[in-house]
Amino acid sequence: MNSTPKAVVIFSGGQDSTTCLFQAIQEFGVENVEVVTFQYGQRHAIELEKAAWIAKDLGVKQTLIDTSVIKAITSNAMMEEREIKQEGNTPNTFVDGRNALFLLYTAIYAKGQGIRTIFTGVCETDFSGYPDCRDVFVKSMNVTLNLAMDYNFNIRTPLMYLTKKQTWALADKLGAFDYIRQHTHTCYLGVEGGCHTCPSCVLREKGLNEYLSEKTSGQKYV
């Protein structure tokens, strides 16, 4: 197999995964980076459309994996037309097992391609109550996959301890601020450009406004 180090990014076309994609490209070179996108039964096609467009625009190979069978065994507001709200300790947008499934399938694909490094944009700081965005989960999954496949994966989480403000700052540092602001999709309701009211849009815009405010006042990102 080719000995050149390569990386694969779990890619949705959103702010976080696109930031990770630019990070991977900076570290590994665009020719050594691939993305994996999942069709898991999400409510809106715009997510998949954005992911495909960005991958093509940046010149990275995209592999689309269908995991929509998950719709038959779990229920949530990400895959069904219902009101988005908090249910107990977890919002009803949480998809049980989604990140575990994404990491498993990406690892299977990566091993077949001789790739060891997997980037995912999960974040514990602004994780919205999703248990599978925690560092302890990702680390345990890394160990599990290594043992399950007898292969040394390295799951990278560049955004794990960043706030949304800091994620915007990282995008700026990577030279991708305008690109990510213009081309990525985050809205839970599937509105082009954002609905400005769903939890995901509110978090994204709050972080953006905080970063722009600090940037114009001359404060530096640490």
Swiss-Prot record:
ATP binds at F11, S12, G13, G14, Q15, D16, S17, T18, T19, C20, L21. The keyword GTP-binding does not apply. Keywords: ATP-binding, Ligase, Metal-binding, Nucleotide-binding, Queuosine biosynthesis, Zinc. Zn(2+) binds at C187, C195, C198, C201. The keyword Metal-binding applies. GO terms for molecular function: ATP binding; ligase activity, forming carbon-nitrogen bonds; zinc ion binding. Binds 1 zinc ion per subunit. Its cofactor is Zn(2+). It comes from the Bacteria. Belongs to the QueC family. PANTHER family: 7-CYANO-7-DEAZAGUANINE SYNTHASE. Catalyzes the ATP-dependent conversion of 7-carboxy-7-deazaguanine (CDG) to 7-cyano-7-deazaguanine (preQ(0)). This is 7-cyano-7-deazaguanine synthase. The gene is queC.
